[in-house]
């Protein structure tokens, strides 16, 4: 990948500003709309936020890690930055499309790169039904909530909730309960990425539920539908010696 125009996105903290000044001395940069690659300096959260902001431009993203985990990021190497981007591996992510309806009947639509989740709003456990492709698969789940995760997001909230890690090329989705109470032994399901999952929330007055698509939250939800979309592919760039697939495999062995 031959790159001449880069855009720089960063937090205005002391550490980021020092690195940005070094990068600006070495390379020319431009506005996001004119760039061939968007470089995000920070952590996974900053990268996800900016993907949501600029994914409509269909420009590849290259993350430089200044956060704590940096699962979706690359290590900092300012002197070889453009060469690393030139040699990088492209990973295509297909986000989830969430449609949520609240108690007033208003419908919200949002995209998620990691996961869509529903969760209880009070101390009362949530109660809901799960349909897959229009077929009822669980008549009632009592839990703190549930989530649907992409392969890229399977090592995040999904893993903490007890779900499996998925290889990027698996064309699967994780459906994982969050602290299931009944049925207690249900640990979730693996579904084809073509599946449509619907959550129908019960008794929302006594047991209110919120929904999230990554960091976007919606209150007092009565129904959520989740499906994968290939209409909005996201290109992430990773250093050739440390691809996202490598990271997912390493994570499964405690790395």
Swiss-Prot record:
Signal peptide annotation: none
GO CC annotations on file: cytoplasm
Keyword annotations: ATP-binding, Cytoplasm, Kinase, NAD, NADP, Nucleotide-binding, Transferase
Molecular functions per Gene Ontology: ATP binding; metal ion binding; NAD binding; NAD+ kinase activity
Cofactor(s) required, per the database record: a divalent metal cation
NCBIfam families: PRK04761.1
Protein name: NAD kinase
The organism of origin for this protein: Rickettsia canadensis (strain McKiel)
């Amino acid at each position: 990948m031959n790159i001449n125009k880069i855009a720089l996105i960063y937090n205005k903290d002391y550490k980021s500003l020092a690195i940005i000044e070094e990068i600006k001395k070495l390379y020319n940069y431009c506005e996001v709309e004119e760039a061939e690659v968007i470089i995000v300096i920070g952590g996974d959260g900053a990268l996800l936020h900016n993907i949501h902001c600029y994914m409509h431009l269909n420009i590849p993203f290259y993350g430089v890690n200044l956060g704590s985990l940096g699962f979706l990021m690359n290590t900092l190497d300012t002197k070889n930055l453009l060469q690393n981007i030139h040699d990088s591996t492209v990973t295509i992510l297909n986000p989830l499309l969430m449609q949520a309806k609240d108690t007033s009947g208003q419908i919200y639509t949002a995209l998620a790169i990691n996961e869509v989740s529903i969760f209880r709003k009070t101390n009362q456990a949530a109660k809901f039904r799960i349909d897959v492709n229009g077929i009822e698969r669980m008549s009632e789940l009592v839990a703190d909530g549930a989530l649907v995760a992409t392969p890229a997001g399977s090592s995040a909230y999904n893993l903490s909730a007890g779900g499996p890690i998925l290889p990027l090329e698996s064309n699967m989705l994780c459906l994982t309960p969050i602290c299931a109470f009944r049925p207690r032994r249900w640990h979730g399901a693996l579904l084809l990425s073509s599946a449509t999952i619907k959550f129908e929330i019960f008794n929302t007055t006594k047991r209110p539920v919120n929904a999230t698509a990554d960091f976007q939250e919606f209150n007092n939800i009565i129904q959520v539908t989740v499906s994968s979309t290939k209409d909005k592919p996201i290109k992430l760039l990773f250093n050739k010696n440390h691809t996202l697939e490598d990271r997912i495999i390493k994570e499964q062995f405690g790395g």
